């Protein structure tokens, strides 16, 4: 299923992205897509950790978005 999420890159570039993608992607794949879209020069930190802001939970990069409970409308901050 496709979900629409907001990706917060304030720890890197200060930009915010709205993306539509599959909930079967891993968190690492989400980061790869965000990096390709914004062409950020810094690489993401080891572990590819993210925080789902509206659920106040942290997740590592190897989990899928479904495993993290990410749904349409969530805001994801890249740590």
Where are these regions (language model features)?
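Short structural boundary motif marking the start of a folded domain
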Residues: 1-6
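Short amphipathic, charge-patterned alpha-helical segments
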Residues: 23-43
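Short, contiguous acidic and Ser/Thr-rich linear segments
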Residues: 11-29
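Short acidic beta-strand-loop surface patches of small beta-rich interaction domains
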Residues: 12-14, 44-66
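Loop/turn positions that initiate beta-strands
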Residues: 73-76
């Amino acid at each position: 299923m496709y979900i629409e999420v907001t990706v917060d890159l304030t720890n890197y570039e200060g930009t915010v992205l709205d993306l539509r993608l599959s909930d079967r992607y891993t968190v690492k794949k989400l980061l790869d897509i965000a990096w390709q879209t914004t062409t950020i020069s810094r690489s993401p930190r080891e572990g590819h950790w993210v925080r789902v802001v509206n659920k106040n939970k942290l997740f590592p990069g190897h989990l899928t978005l479904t495993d993290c409970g990410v749904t349409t409308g969530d805001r994801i901050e890249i740590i």
